[in-house]
A protein has these predicted regions:
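N-terminal subdomain of nucleotide-sugar transferases
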Residues: 1-57, 262-265
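Carbohydrate-associated surface elements
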Residues: 40, 171-174, 194-197
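Membrane-proximal helix-turn-helix segments that form the acceptor-binding/catalytic region
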Residues: 112, 116-120, 148-168
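Nucleotide-activated donor-binding/catalytic signature segment of Leloir-type glycosyltransferases, i.e.
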Residues: 222, 268, 274-277, 282-309
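A short, well-ordered alpha-helix in the C-terminal region of glycosyltransferases
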Residues: 232, 389-402
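Conserved donor-binding/catalytic core segment of Leloir-type glycosyltransferases
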Residues: 237-253, 259-262, 274, 392
Length: 416
């Protein structure tokens, strides 16, 4: 099949690691012809161009800065990107007959691109990978009001995108329930779980023979040595459990609550906290960190993915934070790194997100609401007293059973 994937993510090839690169690599490896449309933000200083890389065709479209920028440029860039993408697709892919039209949110402003592709390819299936429920998430955290013209405009865009989609793949059961409840015009049977997913390296699979046992032991020894090296490299303690948060540091993550949790636990001598990332709220966190230097906390700017993954593997517990005001369920993809590293998790989220409940039900994590610092501290105590290795293994097994690209690939392909 000919497949086109339209995304805001900066993809430079499918041999990278990430939820979209892994999924597109799976489609390629299954024999499909993969075409990806991805932005080149203005800050990178390059023009729109088409390239062939890793056995796929990659169309990089010059846009304004959309991610990790100010609200004005982000908003303008989001409005303009639809036309920029459509013109580029017409120029470079206009002669191709597509069978599957894949696209992800954010943004919700690809409706005309999807409609154009469906007109040109009337037999194609359009499939939305829903990673962001906008504009309701922006209303929830006060970016604009429920009755504002912005919410009215973007809600119309959201509805139009859903109507242009033959199927909507959501990140979790709570996502599915939310979309069905708030969009009754859309056929409920066409909303399904197509979760964030990754490719898992084969060596980490459960051993079945002597040679595999030997390989697994070698892998564990390698990871133990790697952990010592990484902790030395980043000046982290070797004798304490380390709790790590890695990812975006913006308004959706509820950074004020994260800071309150770090403040409440900063004098502990039985554990250590590492925060890695960047975003609009990073300076706020950095200011707090500078005033509390040399305690049991380390704050670091975003690392290259390979370096971050190595750091995560050297830690003991993964942390998830989301703003308590959210009425929409979220499912941050950083969970996958934690589970692949066989780490248990603590999720501090709004009550509508089901990530924490799924973790508790399956024995690989704990959950509290992200407006209760004492409850978070109690979970730190509980985690320190738990069998973290067993919890981490349960998380890894859950990842293998539910969050591999094979799961997402099969979910999409069952419609053909």
């Amino acid at each position: 099949m000919n497949i086109i994937f339209i995304t805001l993510s900066n993809i430079n090839g499918v041999e990278e690691r990430g939820i979209y690169a892994d999924l597109m690599r799976k489609f390629r490896d299954e024999g499909h012809q993969v075409h990806i449309v991805s932005p080149f933000e203005r800050r990178l200083g390059q023009a729109t161009h088409l390239q062939e890389v890793d056995g796929i065709r990659l169309l990089k479209v010059r846009t304004l800065n959309i991610q990790k920028t100010n609200v004005v440029e982000k908003g303008l860039g989001t409005l303009l990107i639809e036309g920029q993408f459509q013109r580029a697709i017409q120029r470079y892919f206009g002669h191709i007959q597509f069978d599957l039209i894949l696209y992800s949110t954010p943004p919700i402003t690809f409706t005309n691109v999807v409609k154009y592709l469906k007109r040109k390819n009337p037999k194609a299936i359009s499939y939305l990978l829903l990673k962001d429920i906008f504009p309701q998430n922006a209303v929830d955290i006060g970016i604009f009001g429920e009755h504002s013209i912005f919410n009215w405009y973007f809600r119309k865009k959201e509805v139009a995108l859903y109507k242009a989609s033959d199927f909507i793949g959501c990140m979790s059961p709570a996502n599915v329930e939310f979309i069905r409840k708030h969009n009754p015009y859309y056929p409920a049977e066409r909303v399904e779980v197509a979760p964030n997913s990754i490719e898992i390296k084969p060596l980490s699979d459960s051993p079945r023979g002597g040679e595999e046992n030997k390989n697994l032991q070698e892998e564990r020894t390698k990871r133990k040595v790697e952990s010592i090296y990484i902790r030395e490299r980043y000046q982290l303690p070797k004798d304490k459990p380390i709790f790590i948060y890695g990812g975006n540091l913006g308004k959706p993550q509820g950074i004020d609550f994260l800071i309150q949790c770090l403040e409440a636990n900063k004098n502990r001598d039985d554990c250590y906290f590492v925060v890695v990332g960047n975003g609009t709220e990073y300076k706020k966190l950095q200011t707090w960190y500078n005033a509390n230097f040399n305690l049991n906390v380390k704050v670091m700017q975003r690392l290259p993915k390979e370096d971050y993954d190595m750091l995560a593997r050297s830690c003991d517990v993964g942390l998830i934070f989301l703003d308590h005001r959210f009425t929409i369920p979220n499912y941050p993809s950083r969970l996958l790194v934690y589970l692949q590293s066989s780490m248990p998790v603590i999720c501090a989220t709004d009550p509508n997100t089901d990530m924490g409940r799924i973790a508790e039900e399956n024995g690989y994590g704990y959950w509290c609401e992200s407006n209760n610092v004492p409850a978070f501290t109690a979970l730190i105590d509980k985690m320190l007293a738990s069998d973290r290795k067993a919890m981490g293994q349960r998380g890894y097994e859950f990842l293998k059973a539910n969050y591999t690209v094979q799961n997402t690939y099969d979910t999409i392909m069952k419609h053909f």
